[in-house]
A protein has these predicted regions:
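Retroelement reverse transcriptase polymerase core
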Residues: 1-242
Length: 242
């Protein structure tokens, strides 16, 4: 979308809460600005429940102003694309042609590489994790965990692996030095390897049999969903842990 937020109107009764002072007087936003705490969730709700109602999660998927349209065949894709264009036209929304990619078999979407078989991460992103130096402060560790948590849906038993690292964030202080234990050191190296080796996640093909593996300990629980393509090939569908 072109300046997506600015295409979302703010209710007249709420405009006063967006007021800001300038040398020329007090102004209020009539369209959604960047920076409001509730802007992302409001924009997502408007797009999913009003603009793309009946289409979202059926023929298209949306993350804020990034929209992806799908189709099993070229004809189906063009039909779905026409429906999306018609809906956006009806709602008065515009697209940025320079940022649009049409008819691609593989696209970069919300940090993932996505195609007809599934999704994965660029190898360069995974390789960079192995080079991450061990954090010396809680602030540095928190940043590291924020990065590896982005990959959690691709890592089996993620929560159990990082538990010793999360424990180091107790009594949080940005400058507090970390006292690394052997368990924490092992967890740090293990999560780096797990992220680096994280598998591609495949879409269900509606034909191959599926099976689930579960695991539990005193620290957490986990589940893994797979589909068996043949006697030698098993594909990962999803991982969950908490």
């Amino acid at each position: 979308l072109t300046s997506g937020y600015h295409q979302a109107p703010i209710h007249k009764n709420c405009q006063k809460y967006t007021a800001f002072l300038t040398p020329f007087g007090l102004y209020e936003w009539v369209r959604l600005p960047m920076g409001l705490a509730g802007a992302p969730s409001y924009f997502q709700r408007v797009m999913c429940t009003e603009v793309l109602a009946g289409l979202h999660a059926i023929i298209c998927f949306l993350y804020l102003d990034d929209l992806i349209v799908t189709g099993r065949t070229e004809e189906e894709f063009l039909h779905n694309l026409s429906r999306i264009f018609q809906r956006l036209r009806e709602k008065g929304l515009t697209l940025n042609p320079e940022k649009c990619v049409l008819g691609a078999c593989e696209v970069e979407y919300v940090g993932h590489t996505l195609n007809s078989t599934g999704l994965h991460f660029e190898r360069s992103k995974l390789d960079s994790i192995l080079d991450w130096e061990k954090p010396s402060t809680q602030k540095q560790l928190k940043r590291f965990l924020g990065v590896v948590n982005w990959f959690r849906d691709h890592v089996k038993n993620h929560s159990t692996i990082v538990k010793p690292l999360n424990a180091l964030l107790r009594n949080y202080s940005k400058t507090l030095k970390i006292q690394w234990s052997q368990e924490a050191n092992e967890a740090f190296e293990k999560i780096k390897r797990a992220v680096h080796e994280c598998p591609r996640l495949y879409f269900l093909d509606d034909v191959s049999p599926i099976f689930m593996e579960t695991d539990a300990s005193q620290y957490g629980i986990g589940a893994s969903l797979y589909q068996r393509i043949d006697e030698k090939t098993v594909q990962a569908i999803a991982f969950m842990s908490k």
